[in-house]
């Protein structure tokens, strides 16, 4: 409860703005690409924690259930997606507080996973992952690079000259990025956010 009170209304600004709430595999399949999260804000009431993600000009608000998943509609570039959000607080081996979120896209059979580390009051670090994710994509990549015979000569030649380990590292960095954020103060902190819980079903 003490941590929630301290977080209430706090805004953090992303150092890297290339990561979005939408899973990478869904961005590709739906041709619906993220604008990248620029700021994140925490709010809470007596029962729930809310997290506002400012992505482009849009505010995506998720309600987080601790005992049961919270159902939330997310509008991504005009397309509606139903999510189930479950969260829990814990600590890592160094005693750092960690908020773990599981954001399941119910109708898509995909899940966005987020761990938010709170090393101190002025900084957070967000570690992203998704399911299906790194393992499936890297396994597919390995099959391709081993030579399928279905590649165009240009792609085949290109794959021959790019080390597989380098490709895997780049893919891992894209699917499982770690982004640092700094606490904002002053009147500009809330600029851009639209405060609403209309998309939260409960």
Residue ranges of predicted features:
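Peripheral terminal and inter-domain segments
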Residues: 1-202
């Amino acid at each position: 409860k003490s941590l929630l009170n301290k977080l209430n209304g706090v805004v953090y600004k992303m150092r890297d703005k290339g990561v979005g709430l939408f899973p990478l595999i869904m961005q590709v399949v739906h041709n619906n690409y993220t604008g990248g999260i620029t700021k994140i804000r925490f709010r809470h009431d007596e029962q729930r924690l809310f997290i506002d993600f400012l992505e482009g000009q849009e505010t995506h608000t998720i309600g987080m259930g601790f005992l049961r998943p919270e159902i939330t509609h997310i509008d991504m570039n005009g397309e509606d997606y139903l999510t189930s959000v479950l969260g829990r607080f814990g600590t890592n081996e160094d005693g750092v507080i960690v908020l773990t979120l599981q954001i399941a896209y119910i109708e898509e059979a995909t899940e966005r996973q987020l761990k938010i580390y709170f090393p101190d009051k002025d900084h957070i670090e967000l570690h992203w992952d998704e399911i299906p994710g790194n393992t499936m994509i890297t396994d597919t990549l390995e099959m391709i690079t081993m030579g399928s015979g279905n590649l165009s000569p240009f792609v085949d030649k290109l794959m021959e000259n790019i080390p597989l380990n380098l490709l895997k590292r780049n893919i891992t960095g894209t699917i499982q990025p770690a982004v640092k954020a700094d606490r904002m103060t002053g009147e500009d902190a809330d600029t851009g956010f639209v405060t609403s819980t209309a998309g939260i079903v409960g």
